[in-house]
Amino acid sequence: MMFGGYETIEAYEDDLYRDESSSELSVDSEVEFQLYSQIHYAQDLDDVIREEEHEEKNSGNSESSSSKPNQKKLIVLSDSEVIQLSDGSEVITLSDEDSIYRCKGKNVRVQAQENAHGLSSSLQSNELVDKKCKSDIEKPKSEERSGVIREVMIIEVSSSEEEESTISEGDNVESWMLLGCEVDDKDDDILLNLVGCENSVTEGEDGINWSISDKDIEAQIANNRTPGRWTQRYYSANKNIICRNCDKRGHLSKNCPLPRKVRRCFLCSRRGHLLYSCPAPLCEYCPVPKMLDHSCLFRHSWDKQCDRCHMLGHYTDACTEIWRQYHLTTKPGPPKKPKTPSRPSALAYCYHCAQKGHYGHECPEREVYDPSPVSPFICYYDDKYEIQEREKRLKQKIKVLKKNGVIPEPSKLPYIKAANENPHHDIRKGRASWKSNRWPQENKETQKEMKNKNRNWEKHRKADRHREVDEDFPRGPKTYSSPGSFKTQKPSKPFHRSSHYHTSREDKSPKEGKRGKQKKKERCWEDDDNDNLFLIKQRKKKS
């Protein structure tokens, strides 16, 4: 009662899916598989049938048995026809071993009628059986095909009969025709199943015709990529990828829908031209752009030998080995050395002459292609001392370039730029910064030295003045200090004055008049201290 009154699950499935054939007999599916595996694709069946009829007539009338009831018929399979198997004496046996099968047709008269139009349409869409079955099958007349349904019987060939059949049919049988076998290299061609090829393009040695289908020509199938970009992809885009063209995440630059950017020149960083058409290329001997008025300050190095790689054409500081020695370094500091030194491989090929046994920098014909070759190997790795020495040499070269005006100096008025950027900029600070940046930083030390020299010179000058005063007045000058000012008073002069002290008022300049007033004030201070009566009387007379 498990299957609703059915004895087995097979009977239940037959009733469920309305399968008329018994599910116990698994021969139906196997026969169908065998039939479809032996089908050949045919073109122009009318011409093929005519050729077969002509061959059969020439072979003789003894083999023809068109009037007999057990006559062999051409099996034609189409979508409209139905293949029926007899329930009587037909026996189908299959073998596990690889064997050649024979197909035999058996006529059974059935009360069925087919019109001529259905027959003609079925013939055009039919498919033929294997070539080895065609040799044993004869062509029936068109009148007899209308009321005949074929039966197919597959019989296993014994080992003794198999040897005989392979002798006669071995020429036409290929390995791919056998069930369970794969395509062998010994097969004649790949179009063994194709029959009736008239529109041949080329004809090979064996007379094999190659044809092109009209449908393929109309479809214009080609293995070419479309010129447009693939904007939609069949897999999920990686969100971590950044496009170099539009700087957005999710796609690569080759799949970017936007137009590509114009490439920059890596010499002048400008767009619109590349390296070879750059208006300001670098000098071959100094790392400075080559202008119209460029005069190289360094010596030519085309005939100089590098002390590092021992190659001609460059100096030691310009050797490519300096940056190639960092191929294992991932942290700042001296380059990391490999544990085992690398050796050149035995298979060496030249990129100039394409010969085996040497590299491009060792090529005897390199003067034609590359007059200044470079070694691809690393001779030795630098240490800290060598790196520091190289940096010192580079700094000296930079100083030479600055003195000659090759490297542009900073702007003379940097506070103007700062004021434009900062609207609340202080002018005093700007002036101070302008004074500090008025001269290059290299001359700051010289400025300090000049200031110190000026100060020392002023000190020596004052000391010399005091010495002259001491020689003229051995008793020493008398100094008077006024509040808020610190001035050195001149020494008092003796009573007897020489003639050169007396000058006329007309000859005195306005500056000398000011000095005279100061002298009178000093004399007043001196008279208060002196008790000489003679001097007091003399002053009264002058006043």
Curated annotation (Swiss-Prot):
Covalent cross-link site, Glycyl lysine isopeptide (Lys-Gly) (interchain with G-Cter in SUMO2): 131, 139, 141, 239, 254, 339, 412, 417, 435, 478, 487, 490, 493, 537
Keywords: Isopeptide bond, Metal-binding, Nucleus, Phosphoprotein, Repeat, Ubl conjugation, Zinc, Zinc-finger
Residues bearing the modification Phosphoserine: 482, 485
GO CC annotation: cytosol; nucleolus; TRAMP complex
Compartments, as annotated in UniProt: Nucleus, Nucleolus
Ranges of biased composition (kind: Low complexity): 59-68
Disordered as annotated region, ranges: 51-71, 414-543
Residue spans of biased composition, Basic residues class: 493-502
Taxonomy, superkingdom: Eukaryota
Main location: nucleus
Positions with biased composition (Polar residues): 479-491
Basic and acidic residues compositional bias, start-end: 441-457, 465-475, 503-515
SMART domains to which the protein is assigned, alphabetical: ZnF_C2HC
Molecular functions (GO terms): RNA binding; zinc ion binding
GO biological process: nuclear mRNA surveillance of mRNA 3'-end processing; nuclear polyadenylation-dependent CUT catabolic process; nuclear polyadenylation-dependent rRNA catabolic process; nuclear polyadenylation-dependent snoRNA catabolic process; nuclear polyadenylation-dependent snRNA catabolic process; TRAMP-dependent tRNA surveillance pathway
Oligomeric form and interacting partners: Component of a nucleolar TRAMP-like complex, an ATP-dependent exosome regulatory complex consisting of a helicase (MTREX), an oligadenylate polymerase (TENT4B or TENT4A), and a substrate specific RNA-binding factor (ZCCHC7 or ZCCHC8). Several TRAMP-like complexes exist with specific compositions and are associated with nuclear, or nucleolar RNA exosomes.
Protein name: Zinc finger CCHC domain-containing protein 7
Organism classification: Eukaryota, Metazoa, Chordata, Craniata, Vertebrata
